[in-house]
């Protein structure tokens, strides 16, 4: 009362009642306490994964060929968590992570170590495939120059895997000039299997077509360097309970315990 300079209570021999000013303050205080209780309940629900959101940035290819089993198991265990997937190239999903639009991002190149914590998941390898009846010799070993002379089917230039493969060939003085450029990794296999050319694909994401024999690998005289798929988080920003639990599922599959060491 002395701090506000008004009388909040009316005191009589029968007891204490609120004044008009006291009633106004009581209404605001009751609302504040109600909001505080709601906030505490929301935090408790988030901690117990009864509510919340999991936001992930990842390419559509990795979503289909890698993340689907994890997303299925996560949803079965935590059905009340809203899962939000934002698709894009590695560069794009790392931008989303850096701006806080997603909590987790899967990328196929190592980002800035000062901004992100990086956890290795698995390595990928480039192979060139064609239909079994394509006019080439699957028993022969081809040089990279000979590969570059085939009618090539590649991902569009914006894809990080396309840029990586182009760089590998450029380092050897070779330029890739594809006959067909696509936005979908899945379509690479589809067009190769009908004989439209030789497709440059990620082997680990093409096992279905390879195992079924709809396409076959060409043998290379020189192996193209592998690439690593990594899980990234914002450095010095603890993940939410929902994101942390998803990371535990990924960790159980790949065994990482700490961020990967960065070169340099």
PLM feature spans:
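Short amphipathic alpha-helical coupling segments at ligand-binding clamshell hinges
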Residues: 21, 25-28, 66, 70, ...
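Central regulatory/effector-binding core of bacterial HTH transcription factors
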Residues: 51-114, 182-184
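A late-sequence structural motif
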Residues: 66, 129, 216-259
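Hydrophobic hinge/microswitch elements
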Residues: 89-94, 98-102, 107-108, 160-218
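Secondary-structure junction motif
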Residues: 136-137, 151-172, 239-248, 254-262
